[in-house]
């Protein structure tokens, strides 16, 4: 059952997910714990929550953070059922220096489905909105596409190892602990030269262990799903986000949650792009567990603006 109220734990007001007391955490686990804290929200009033951004040198808030926090806000108001779909629009760049208010509209509480609308606000203006739908578990027909045949994530180097040749170019970012472990199958974007096929595959997982709460796992994967996907839209053009001529930003994001999963287990993010045009790129993602279950489908459109 989703955690929907602060009374579920004997903890301070900002706690949604249980904390660990182990002080000997490795860097990645500490980074993951910091992400869990980031996704926790302060209750301001009924249906109103406040989130913060990490103390990082960013010009704007990472879109996955806003989407993950918005899903937390929606889930806080739902008594029963699990998230089965969300549809979101990124309206304005988020300011990382000020908190984000999340206002939840309880659209519908039905017998099988519950619908919520969430608006994220900064400086008196909406920067993001999301519609999320929750569904009671219900038996029915089952089918899915098979997982592609790919190398095991344990045979692939992690992100930091792959980026070692470029560490002088990226500076302090290279040494920063990462809450999400990403392992590319084949070349990473920075390693590619010339036009490529319009698809890529990435293994990802939370870089540590998480509590069992399914709301938390859905929110962590929502955060992570905004990573790497738009890369595919530039593969046919021989360009990457490292190119100084390219401006990239998420415009909208949709997810469908098909089956249970753990975000701290390996997940294959199978990605492809059908089209890029009018300075917008569209990308699809299918997310599989390591044992082959299709658990989430993702579609994202992004701004892909190239300057001369």
Region annotations inferred by a language model:
Residues 2-308:
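Terminal targeting signals and extreme-terminal segments of soluble enzymes
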């Amino acid at each position: 059952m989703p955690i929907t109220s602060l009374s579920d734990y004997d903890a301070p007001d900002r706690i949604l997910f249980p904390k660990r007391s182990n002080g000997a955490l490795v860097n990645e686990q500490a980074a993951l714990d910091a992400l869990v804290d980031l996704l926790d929200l302060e209750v301001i009033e009924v249906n109103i929550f406040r989130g913060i951004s990490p103390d990082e040198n960013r010009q704007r808030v990472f879109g996955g953070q806003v989407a993950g926090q918005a899903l937390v806000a929606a889930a806080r108001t739902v008594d029963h059922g699990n998230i089965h779909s969300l549809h979101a629009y990124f309206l304005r760049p988020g300011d990382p220096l000020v908190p984000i208010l999340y206002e939840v509209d309880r659209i519908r509480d039905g017998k099988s489905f519950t619908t919520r609308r969430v608006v994220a606000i900064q400086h008196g203006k909406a920067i993001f909105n999301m519609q999320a739908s929750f569904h009671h578990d219900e038996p029915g027909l089952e089918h899915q596409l098979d997982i592609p045949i790919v190398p095991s994530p344990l045979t692939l180097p992690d992100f930091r190892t792959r980026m070692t040749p470029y560490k002088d170019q990226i500076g302090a970012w290279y040494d920063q602990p990462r809450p999400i472990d990403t392992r590319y199958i084949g070349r990473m974007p920075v390693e590619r030269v010339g036009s490529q096929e319009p698809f890529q595959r990435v293994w990802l997982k939370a870089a540590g262990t998480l509590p069992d709460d399914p709301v938390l796992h859905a929110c962590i994967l929502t955060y992570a799903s905004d990573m790497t996907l738009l890369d595919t839209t530039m593969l046919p053009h021989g360009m990457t986000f490292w190119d100084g001529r390219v401006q990239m930003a998420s415009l909208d994001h949709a997810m469908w949650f098909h089956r249970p999963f753990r975000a701290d287990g390996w997940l294959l993010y199978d990605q492809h792009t059908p089209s890029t045009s009018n300075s917008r790129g569209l990308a699809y993602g299918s997310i599989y567990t390591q044992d082959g279950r299709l658990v989430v489908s993702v579609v994202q459109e992004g701004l892909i603006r190239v300057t001369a």
